[in-house]
Amino acid sequence: MSKRENIKTTIEEIVAYWSEHEDESGLSVDFSEAHERCWRCGYKRKLERCHIVPASRGGEVKPSNFVLLCKKCHKENPNITDSKIMWDWLRAYAVPFYNTFRINMGIIEYEKIYGITVQEECAKRKINDYEELRSIMKEKTKELSYHFGEGCFNSSTIAGWIRITLEEYDKRHNLKTDKNIEPLVSRKRVI
């Protein structure tokens, strides 16, 4: 098996190409910062040149066949020969504000695990004072940890952080935290 050639296409060439050929509306990044922020999560990270059409499937080494992703997002990107799928994926995960992607993924993960949205959890408790929740979340941060080699909390850690925050809120207000956990595949709205 031959070793793949080093990619000669630069980050600047990729940004220049896509800033003229793709609308940044609905993406997690503005093209003015696309050279330093991941195009999926929007965080400032070391960027990797990610093939749109995989090299293993004949993807070319030219600006039109690359997007810029952080290592974590690069591992999760679609590896398929239809280039539209990459742009569908990027737009589906777009967030309107920088540095909110991971918390949003944690909120989605929370619903998957507990079968209820965070918004519904707050409404059920009639929470109007979010400062108290923020304060509890800050206290609970000491109970969290990154996986070795990762620089951020994963979505299940964030979902757990939300859960222990709500449990503490319930404890302080003499409320009972629901413990109904069903397998995701048995819920009606899945598949």
Where in this protein do the model-derived segments appear?
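Histidine-centered catalytic micro-motifs used for acid/base chemistry in nuclease
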Residues: 48-52
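Short cysteine/histidine-rich metal-coordination sites, predominantly Zn2+-binding motifs
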Residues: 53-61, 84-94
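Cys/His-rich microdomains that often coordinate metals
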Residues: 42-46, 77
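Short, charged surface segments at domain edges that flank catalytic/cofactor-binding sites
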Residues: 1-37, 59
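PEST-like low-complexity intrinsically disordered regions enriched in Ser/Thr/Pro and acidic residues
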Residues: 94-127
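Short cysteine-rich clusters marking metal-coordination/redox-active sites
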Residues: 38-41, 70
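C-terminal, charged low-complexity interaction regions
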Residues: 135-191
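Short beta-strand-alpha-helix junction that forms the catalytic/metal-binding core
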Residues: 59-77
